[in-house]
């Protein structure tokens, strides 16, 4: 309940905010629904890796508060990924019927990955159950699977990012296998792709566009709406399920952590032409300010 409420409440707050800013700041060729959905999803995600790091540094990993916060963030991220997939399918479709087709094919693809690909990968996981090292051929195969899955979802009308995510989800549940593969993937992604992504995002962000007081006011509104939606949704739902007011306040603050995933959502919206350069700059600035404030509070 906490995870879904803390995702859905800021999502609708974001859509409501989009209603008031659409006429003035959105591209006239962009449908309102696509614009509102992207603003909503960008405000509704909790940065799970950032939250996990904060909980670890504060020594809350094995506490009741830390467990609830991490579980809520993990479930909320899954909800956000599903919402993002639907949002992209709707935004890329020319009509509602096309959006339904995109969503239907995407569901079929997910079913195929879980019913056909996952059992095959589980067999591989059993083979490497007690091994400390994975051979290069298997590593190459896993990378090929990630790329293929990303390419197929791009064809189906979703973003390539979603396909890579699904490929990661269907990996064998073997903890040792996942740990080794995570290290292999991170060797490439953290050292090469992530810095390039930040460079690309920095080049896209035109802070100079924020040259009017009204845009800075819009940035402040985004910050307030995002914090209020996330904090309120998490806090009141935590209180509803029986948590104390103190723990509910802590959960609301912890669920307000922001990070890379929000930036990915904004970048996708910008690449698809749904977010204008000025809205992207405002959203990026609000994200950085929100992330800094949340980390200081936590």
Where do the protein language model's features map onto the residues?
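Membrane-interface helix termini and inter-helical loops of multi-pass transporters
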Residues: 22-29, 90-99, 206-214
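Conserved small/polar residues in nucleotide/adenosyl-binding loops
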Residues: 285-292
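Structural signature of hydrophobic alpha-helical transmembrane segments
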Residues: 33-44, 102-111, 156-167, 217-226
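The feature identifies polytopic integral membrane transport proteins across all domains of life
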Residues: 1-5, 26-43, 53-74, 180, ...
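Transmembrane alpha-helical segments of multi-pass membrane transport proteins and ion-pumping complexes
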Residues: 7-15, 19, 45-49, 81-85, ...
């Amino acid at each position: 309940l906490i995870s879904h409420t803390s995702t859905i409440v800021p999502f609708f707050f974001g859509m409501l905010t989009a209603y008031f800013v659409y006429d003035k700041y959105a591209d006239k060729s962009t449908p309102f629904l696509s614009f509102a959905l992207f603003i909503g999803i960008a405000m509704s995600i909790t940065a799970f890796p950032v939250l996990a790091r904060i909980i670890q540094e504060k020594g809350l990993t094995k506490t009741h508060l830390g467990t609830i916060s991490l579980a809520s963030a993990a479930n909320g991220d899954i909800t956000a990924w599903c919402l993002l997939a639907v949002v992209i399918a709707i935004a890329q479709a020319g009509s509602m019927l096309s959006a339904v087709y995109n969503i239907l094919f995407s569901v079929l693809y997910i079913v195929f990955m879980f019913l056909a690909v996952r059992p095959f990968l589980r067999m591989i996981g059993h083979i490497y159950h007690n091994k400390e090292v994975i051979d290069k051929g298997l590593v190459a195969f896993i990378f090929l699977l990630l790329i293929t899955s990303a390419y197929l979802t791009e064809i189906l009308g979703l973003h390539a990012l979603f396909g890579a995510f699904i490929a990661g989800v269907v990996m064998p549940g073997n903890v040792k296998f996942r740990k080794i593969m995570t290290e292999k993937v991170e060797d490439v992604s953290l050292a090469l792709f992530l810095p390039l992504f930040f460079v690309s995002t920095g080049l896209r962000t035109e802070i100079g566009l924020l040259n009017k007081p009204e845009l800075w006011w819009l940035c402040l509104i985004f910050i307030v709406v995002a914090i209020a939606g996330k904090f309120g949704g998490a806090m009141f739902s935590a209180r509803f399920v029986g948590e104390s007011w103190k723990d509910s306040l802590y959960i609301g603050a912890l669920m307000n952590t922001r990070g890379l995933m929000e930036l990915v959502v904004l970048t996708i919206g910008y690449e698809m032409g749904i977010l204008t350069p000025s809205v992207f700059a405002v959203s990026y600035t609000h994200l950085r300010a929100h992330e800094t404030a949340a980390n200081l509070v936590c």
